[in-house]
Amino acid sequence: MAKKALIARETKRQKLVQKYAAKRLEFKERIRTAESIREVVSIQREFQGLPRNSSKVRLKNRCAKTGRPKGYYRDFGLSRHVLREMAHQGLLPGVRKASW
């Protein structure tokens, strides 16, 4: 299981991304419609004032149960280990063992 601090850091990043999403879109739109280079540079300076962790690219997908960053299944929000265990226990509706 991942350290509690790593899980907490990731949830904090998710909150920051949601908080600043509208502001980031506004800045990007202003940059796109800017008429002069100076205007673009001044808008970019304002844009750089936003928190670094408010960018979506800094997010890392983690398992909701264990916090594991690798082997993550987007559809379920779980790592492969937890997904397998929950599927065997019948806790995931519509998921069953493959047979061909």
UniProtKB/Swiss-Prot annotation:
This is Small ribosomal subunit protein uS14c. Signal peptide: none annotated. It holds the Pfam family Ribosomal_S14. Gene3D superfamilies: 1.10.287.1480. The gene is rps14. One of its GO terms (molecular function) is rRNA binding. It comes from Ostreococcus tauri. Its main location: plastid. GO terms for cellular component: chloroplast; small ribosomal subunit. Part of the 30S ribosomal subunit. The lineage of its organism: Eukaryota, Viridiplantae, Chlorophyta, Mamiellophyceae, Mamiellales. It is found in: Plastid, Chloroplast.
